Amino acid sequence: MENKEKKQMLTTKLTKEKNGGSAGMIQDMSINGIKLQVFQNGTGGPVIFWGMYPHQQNEVEHLWESLLELVPEQNFLLVAFQVENWNRDFSPWEASAVFGKEGFAGQGLKTMRWLTEECVPHIDRTFGVKDREHWLMGYSLAGLFALWAAYESDVFSGIVCCSGSLWFPDWDHYVRDHVVQ
């Protein structure tokens, strides 16, 4: 049995134990080259889209387990999507390097278009969740991306910005000149 299969089986087993024996659904998929992990707890509740970097794989499972522990009766669908390049794919516009040597390529709009035009519709169709609340969350630069998405799109009814990179060059000017959708 491959490592990935063992990991998925372990996650499913943990889900069954923490959820009183009823397994939540866990599914890996890819949409236009971007990897997703989808965790479903129950049949209702919000759809939470979480932008993350590929090396944070265990973070998805940790969040899943934490949610089941904190609010075991809350139904939700968690969709973790993995960008290829953190500074490129989550930055709303180009900016020089702030920490280290790598600058910000400003491809956030491309990521948001993929998210709102491909990912969200696919998840809505596949899981029948079009009428449920859709939230976007992220940590650090992905948190800034989530907040920026609130100004650029009306797809999400809620935003979770954890320790967002609000230091990002010209963010203060952007917020002053734009309105949340």
Positions of PLM-derived features:
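Non-catalytic cap/lid and distal C-terminal segments of serine-dependent acyl enzymes
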Residues: 6-181
